[in-house]
Amino acid sequence: MNIFNKNLHETDKEINEIIKHEKLRQSSVIELIASENFVSPAVLEAQGSLLTNKYAEGYPSKRFYNGCEEVDKAENLAIERVKKLFNCKYANVQPHSGSQANQAVYLALLQPGDTVLGMSLDSGGHLTHGAAPNMSGKWFNVVSYSVNKETYLIDYDEIERLADLHKPKLLIAGFSAYPRNIDFAKFREIVDKVGAYFMADIAHIAGLVATGEHQSPIPYAHAVTSTTHKTLRGPRGGLILSNDEEIGQKINSALFPGLQGGPLMHIIAAKAVAFLENLQPEYKSYIQQVISNAKALASSLQERGYDILTGGTDNHIVLVDLRKDGITGKFAANSLDRAGITCNKNAIPFDETSPFITSGIRLGTPACTTRGFKEKDFVLVGYMVADILDGLKNNEDNSDLEQKVLNEVTKLIKLFPFYG
């Protein structure tokens, strides 16, 4: 059988139809999932290239396979570009995901049973920062810090107290649902007092850090991890950065052969393309627009009477606290989805509701900003979200209002470009 003369439509009509329908879905909804974005056609082209055929265990010039001359060039380009982007001395672009980037740092710096101090999941932390169901929560002695019960801001005094008490081997800064800036310098002060390692997980705010719109952790953290999608607008994957090249060598060994085998060279090439795009002046303008749009979205919801956690946002995330409204996050997210607005249910700090139900929703602006939305558009989006939430407060059957908002979404989204 000659596989080289058949395209996807000819080979697998079912998958081809799924992709077509997913393209239609992505093009026709207002995407407010904070961890999602739209990559450029150039990134898609690299990711779908024949580099997927090449095995390349090891690192450039130190491979376990022959024939790696071209993929070595691609990986070196990705490394040099991302080092320039974040102004750092070391980068590893091989992690398959942000979770595996975090695991590689743990494997490099920790032993099973070591104490780790990270943000609790319900306060906005990530599964891989020590949550009980995750490997990090099973292998290490985890102590969690939370946000202030009144302001919902990071409580640096509590972190310092817990660090003094428990003497962690590793302190983690980072989040999956926290709308304010992080003081990485303060984290480093705490770390130095107790002799710990400091890891900053910037998966959500990497684009803000790269463009100077958020304090960089590079001068302070022993290791910095990130995803390469979200605000970096690249392929789904992971990344590890550092200014400590000795720690970098430990991380290299931890990732391969410790954690992964062959890297995904088509993904690494796509990362390189995204990093090149991120080095262009217009990328900084994009990130600034992401932040401005998030502020507009938060303000429009506040105007309609909804509680925005911490009273606003410094980044791309808007967390809506629905406790006083008597609506669950799951109920709200499902109704919004039917109205053509995708987001996710999200726990609120000190939330007593099940994590499968939650008391809030998380909204984000990166994806629609990529499509060209400005502040005025996000004000309209905020009003649409509020309309749906208002309807849920009055009537569990929100179908008529969902259809009305869906019509408004369809009218608005057609004004903005998508893949041809």
From Swiss-Prot:
Q: Where is this site: Plays an important role in substrate specificity?
A: H229
- Annotated compartments: Cytoplasm
Query: PROSITE patterns recorded for this chain?
Result: SHMT
Q: In which pathway does it act?
A: One-carbon metabolism; tetrahydrofolate interconversion; Amino-acid biosynthesis; glycine biosynthesis; glycine from L-serine: step 1/1
Question: What is the protein name given in its UniProt record?
Answer: Serine hydroxymethyltransferase
* Organism phylogeny: Bacteria, Pseudomonadati, Pseudomonadota, Alphaproteobacteria, Rickettsiales
What role is this protein assigned? Catalyzes the reversible interconversion of serine and glycine with tetrahydrofolate (THF) serving as the one-carbon carrier. This reaction serves as the major source of one-carbon groups required for the biosynthesis of purines, thymidylate, methionine, and other important biomolecules. Also exhibits THF-independent aldolase activity toward beta-hydroxyamino acids, producing glycine and aldehydes, via a retro-aldol mechanism.
Q: How does it assemble?
A: Homodimer.
Residues annotated as binding (6S)-5,6,7,8-tetrahydrofolate = L121, G125, H126, L127, E246, S354, P355, F356
Q: Locate the N6-(pyridoxal phosphate)lysine modifications and list their residues.
A: K230
List the keywords (alphabetical). Answer: Amino-acid biosynthesis, Cytoplasm, One-carbon metabolism, Pyridoxal phosphate, Transferase
